[in-house]
Amino acid sequence: MYFKNIIGQKNIIKQLNLLFENNQVPHSQIFIDRYNSGGLPIALDYSLLLLNNQHKTNLNQKIEIKRNYFEHPDLNFIFPLPGPKNTISEFLSPWFEFLKSKKYHPVEDWLNHIESGNKQGIISVEVIKELNKSLRLKSFSGGKKICIIWGAEKLNELASNKLLKLIEEPPSLTYFLIISKNEKKLLPTLKSRCQVIRIPPTKNEDIKSYYTEVGIENNKQAYLINASMGSSSRAIKLSEDEKNTIKLEEMLIKCLRLSFSAQKT
């Protein structure tokens, strides 16, 4: 059930499963997703694995988590916002929409999704302060709490230092899953407090399997795989473009046939 819809990344998934099975999950991990090849989707499924396997979680809670786990009350999200005065709560609704269909997409697509204009996005110190308050509250299930911080390269200096302090003195049973595309923009001391997992480019054979699964014709796959350049995000976008092109061609053919039939009558 877990990691079922991840494109490739079998070694990363194996590593995470082993950490869980051996009860060695560190309380803070950084996923470097330089190629947009699954950092956020992997973190989401990893959260499901952690939240859905607690001795205090009953069957009904498990079913609910399976259905809509990214809205679980013990799962907290931090993501880039248009400006320092914005709050996470005011963008949760579009965020959940984004997760349903675009979780492989990069930060830039998220900022476009919320129509941020030319703003580059920021994770401010006020956002981390609010996170700190939230994590100090008792968990809904009486067990673990998880925080996914996506687009961590957008943390400003004050926010980075505040997060560092939170990670150094975490609330009990709290886990931080931090995702960043740009490792160089992360605070070195923050990295030193976390287990760093670097997500490699998605293998061509895994992208090919994905294209076959979504119905891309074999004779078009090689070009699209090369154009994907190891990025799952780019591979998905290219498949969507290809499907849209096919639909347009089908509509054009249908219109031409209707026009031809009308001329005959």
What label would you give each PLM region?
Residues 1-69, 172-175, 181-265:
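Charged, glycine-rich active-site and insertion segments that engage polyanionic ligands
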Residues 2-154, 158:
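Clamp-loader machinery-focused feature within the broader ASCE/P-loop NTPase space
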Residues 133, 165, 192:
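Conserved adenine-binding aromatic site and its adjacent loop/helix in ATP-hydrolyzing domains
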Residues 136, 161-172:
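Conserved catalytic/switch belt of AAA+ P-loop NTPases
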Residues 141-146, 171-177:
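Loop/turn-to-beta-strand initiation segments
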Residues 154, 169, 185:
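Residues immediately C-terminal
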